[in-house]
């Protein structure tokens, strides 16, 4: 399988290369792709050295699969060019997610909808993935009426500049700012730009993408997204109201049996999800399950995942694995 990684020198791109190796993805030829300033650089992967190429060169090489993590503008311009030569593109940006003609895929939930005709496939937002993976089996059983989510998001979701800003501030060094305010010892209630309704793009991604992935626009979702000085992963406080009542132990059993979820919910041993322990892992961790005593049929939970892995790179490669296994590429 000829695989191009677009944005190979970026934070998510580097993790994608790592995950491809870890999961023994059937790569016969690797094509690392990056911006012009990185073209010609060499990267090591699986014991071999590869030269970084530009986008046009990569298109001409006609890869079977192109894994994109290079921003929305690059995806909008170049994903169709790859698709035209027969490449299947799996894109990490928000560029194609809400396009009605494109699938928005979390493999454990809706990979079976994919066909050979799907040449541009959208990977959901990191904070959406961990939430919908948890919600999907519960929606199937109890039907979700409303979701209230507050996110506590890792600076790695912003990128290398944000990590550098935190390190600079921690060490008392002046440097380039990824955020409009200090992030060290702070919480910034703005992830991405504001939309006309007063919500950020990140908050509205949680609303729109959840409805699309779960294929149910009747689910009411409201979100608040906060950036915090953490690197291990995103955390979410999620309040879910069902149409039907539930038993807490049944919810635990459903989540325990759901592929990709690790239940960490033992108050006696103070066991619950935390980003410092989610870092570097592919599962979504769920805990602090408790009945909402303020209204019926409602549960509170705490969801944590490594936003660079299941929230980005791993989910992308799981989609690619599904395509290969089912001979869709």
Residue ranges with predicted function:
Residues 66, 155-329:
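Charged docking surfaces used in two-component/phosphorelay signaling
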Residues 1-183, 218-220, 284-285, 289-295, ...:
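N-terminal Rossmann-like NAD(P) cofactor-binding subdomain of oxidoreductases
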């Amino acid at each position: 399988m000829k695989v191009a990684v677009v944005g190979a020198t970026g934070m998510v791109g580097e993790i994608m290369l790592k995950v491809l190796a870890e999961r023994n993805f059937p790569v016969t030829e690797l094509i690392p792709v990056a911006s012009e300033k990185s073209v010609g650089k060499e990267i090591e992967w699986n014991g071999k050295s590869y030269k970084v190429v530009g986008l046009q060169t990569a298109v001409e090489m006609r890869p079977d699969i192109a894994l994109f993590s290079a921003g929305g503008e690059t995806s909008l311009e170049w994903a169709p060019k790859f698709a035209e030569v027969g490449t299947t593109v799996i894109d990490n940006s928000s560029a194609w997610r809400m396009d009605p003609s494109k699938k928005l895929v979390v493999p454990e939930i809706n990979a079976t909808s994919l066909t050979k005709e799907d040449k541009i496939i959208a990977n959901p937002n990191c904070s959406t993935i961990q939430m919908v993976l948890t919600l999907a089996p519960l929606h199937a059983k109890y039907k979700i009426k409303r979701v209230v989510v507050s996110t506590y998001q890792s600076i790695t979701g912003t990128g290398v500049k944000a990590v550098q800003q935190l390190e600079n501030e921690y060490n008392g060094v002046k440097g380039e700012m990824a955020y409009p305010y200090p992030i060290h010892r702070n919480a910034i209630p703005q992830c991405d730009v504001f939309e006309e309704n007063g919500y950020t793009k990140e908050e509205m991604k949680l609303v729109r993408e959840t409805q699309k992935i779960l294929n149910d626009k009747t689910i009411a979702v409201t979100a608040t997204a906060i950036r915090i000085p953490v690197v291990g992963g995103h955390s979410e406080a999620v309040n879910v109201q069902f149409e039907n009542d539930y038993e807490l132990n049944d919810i635990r059993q459903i989540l325990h049996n759901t592929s990709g979820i690790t239940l960490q919910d033992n108050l006696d041993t103070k066991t619950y999800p935390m980003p410092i322990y989610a870092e570097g892992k592919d599962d979504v961790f769920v805990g602090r399950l408790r009945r909402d005593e303020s209204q019926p049929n409602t549960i509170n939970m705490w969801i944590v995942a490594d936003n660079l892995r299941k929230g980005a790179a791993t989910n992308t490669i799981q989609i690619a694995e599904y395509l290969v296994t089912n001979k869709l590429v």
